[in-house]
Amino acid sequence: MGAVHGVCYGMVGDNLPSRSDVVQLYKSRNIHAMRIYNPDQEALTALRGSGIFLILDVGGVDEVRRLGRDPSYAAGWVRSNVQAYYPDVLIRYIAVGNEVPAGDTGIILLAMQNVHNALASANLSSSIKVSTAVRFDVITNSFPPSSGVFRDPSGLVPIARFLDSTGAPFLANVYPYFAYRDDRGQNIRLNYATLQPGTTVRDNGNGLTYTSLFDAMVDSIYAALEKAGTPNVRVVVSESGWPSAGGFGASVENARNYNQGLIDHIRSGTPKRPGAIETYIFAMFNENRKPGDEVERNFGLFFPNKQPVYPTTFPN
């Protein structure tokens, strides 16, 4: 399908536009894919006939556990949230959990299997793939990229094998920003972190040269998938972004450089895997009710009044 460039639509704010206004904003800005974090019925209704591809998250950990424990609950979930909307809503993937703690990987796999089986019973499993979105720190030894390996192979390898057997992608939330912030600029250069030219890093393990931390992070995931025996599983970057305020390295200039750089870059792929990378920028809006550090409320491309925080251009 070429380079899919999506934006994550978080709703953790009390001043955000209506769901239908948000869908129109996506269309007017040439944003062709969306991720939502639960099956919000208003959003799904607004997406009908929009032509926008969708990653649909099932919701929080409690929902993942219910889906894992009860195949009939999973079948009902698919009926209510998928069959009721597809194909008017172009659901592409179902994310069973977002950054679920490592101790729950067993129930994640059961939930993924139950949702996949429910889709198969509805003759939808070839069109809609089931995955889970993980934090980047499921990878250890991520530098050099060729050394990447799963931190918890007993939990992640069975998930990778399930993805391989069903033709589903590995969804990973990849944030060079947090690596740069935690490093405090000691070893990671800002231009390398924000996809700007000027820094090259050679991986002596695979002979490849890297000009961005994003590429190095993605390729370390591919290295881990290869070591797990699943080299054909494709990585989809289910979140990536840079905050415009609220913490070390967070500024409008850095956020624009990173996010516009990412939009422009995903068409070319990584040194290890040339070709388009399906990528979802986090996030559409600054969300004023998001918990955590101040940066968490400043990842948006847009203010709640639909005005851009800084200019970005998405290709047609």
Curated annotation (Swiss-Prot):
Q: Which GO terms describe its molecular function?
A: glucan endo-1,3-beta-D-glucosidase activity
Family, similarity comment: Belongs to the glycosyl hydrolase 17 family.
Query: Kind of enzyme, top EC level?
Result: hydrolase
* Compartment(s): Cytoplasm
Gene3D superfamilies in the cross-refs? Glycosidases
Q: Which Pfam families match?
A: Glyco_hydro_17
**Which superkingdom does the taxonomy of this entry point to?**
Eukaryota
Instruction: Tell me which species this is from.
Output: Hordeum vulgare
Q: Its biological function?
A: May provide a degree of protection against microbial invasion of germinated barley grain through its ability to degrade fungal cell wall polysaccharides.
The UniProt keywords, alphabetically, are: Cytoplasm, Glycosidase, Hydrolase, Plant defense
CC annotations in GO:
cytoplasm
Q: Write out the catalytic residues in the record.
A: 99, 239
Q: Which reaction is this enzyme known to catalyze?
A: Hydrolysis of (1->3)-beta-D-glucosidic linkages in (1->3)-beta-D-glucans
Q: Which GO terms describe its biological process?
A: carbohydrate metabolic process; defense response
Q: Which PANTHER family match?
A: GLUCAN ENDO-1,3-BETA-GLUCOSIDASE BG1-RELATED-RELATED (PTHR32227)
* Protein name per its UniProtKB record: Glucan endo-1,3-beta-glucosidase GV
**What EC identifiers does the entry list?**
3.2.1.39
